[in-house]
A protein has these predicted regions:
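Non-transmembrane, membrane-adjacent beta-strand/coil modules in membrane-associated proteins
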Residues: 69, 80-147, 160-163
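N-terminal membrane-targeting/pre-transmembrane regions
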Residues: 1-44, 130-131, 144-151, 155-184, ...
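Hydrophobic alpha-helical transmembrane segments
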Residues: 25-28, 41-57, 199-200
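Transmembrane-cytosolic junction motif
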Residues: 61-80, 191-200
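Short small/polar-residue motifs
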Residues: 3-6, 64-71, 99-103
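A short linear-motif detector with a strong N-terminal bias
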Residues: 49-52, 57-59, 73-76, 81-84, ...
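Short N-terminal secondary-structure initiator segments
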Residues: 18-22, 52-72
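N-terminal start-of-chain detector that recognizes signal peptides
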Residues: 42-45, 50-53, 68, 74-76, ...
């Protein structure tokens, strides 16, 4: 039986294609944040509990904003950024017209993977290399994004893949789910008086 093929990314009326962070990666990171910080108000000293109760949702908004990064393609060029609701305060992102993209440069990471940078064409009359911009590799439909990038720039993207294989995030998702389940069971035990925190 043939492997199922993921549906292509949707195309807006103006021809823009958007590539958000892959759902497996985004929701795993969000769940991991919750698993790590939800117990903190209960475990903290009484004087810090109210502050932590307020800090947890603020941190969640920050993680939601960071993981909302997306890549957009249209007839003019390539853009990397965030939705309007958080772009004004994150102030991250970049954009390049297609004709300004001159090369794709790999850089090895300390974990043995490779990240890729999109390099701007060198300005006429200068000897310095063009500025480089980090290319997101955790997006949904990465293979389609690379096909579009190669078709529009003529650069070879066949060597560009994900920084980490999917099984690493699948394993992290399972471990995170187990952490959340254990915390829910512990919370239920505390609520029923079946268990008490040390020092309480």
């Amino acid at each position: 039986m043939a492997n199922p093929v993921a549906p292509p990314s949707p195309v807006a009326a103006d021809g823009t294609r958007a590539y958000p962070m892959a759902p497996l990666i985004r929701f795993t990171l969000l769940a991991l944040y919750l698993a790590l910080v939800l117990p903190l108000p209960l475990l903290a000293p009484a004087g810090l509990r109210l502050a932590l109760v307020g800090a947890v949702p603020l941190g969640l908004v920050l993680v939601l904003a960071i993981t909302s990064e997306r890549v957009e393609l249209d007839q003019r060029g390539l853009r990397v950024g965030h939705p309007v609701w958080c772009a004004w305060w994150l102030r991250r992102g970049w954009s390049l017209p297609w004709e300004s993209i001159a090369a794709l440069t790999p850089v090895a990471t300390s974990q043995g993977g490779r990240v890729w940078y999109v390099r701007r064409a060198t300005a006429a009359g200068t000897a310095s290399p063009g500025q480089a911009y980090l290319l997101p590799q955790r997006v949904q439909h990465l293979a389609e994004l690379m096909e579009q990038l190669q078709a529009r720039t003529g650069l070879d993207t066949s060597a560009i893949g994900r920084i980490s294989p999917p099984w690493t995030y699948q394993l992290l998702a399972v471990l995170t789910a187990l952490m959340l389940a254990a915390e829910l069971l512990a919370g239920a035990a505390l609520a029923r008086g079946l268990w008490s925190l040390p020092g309480s």
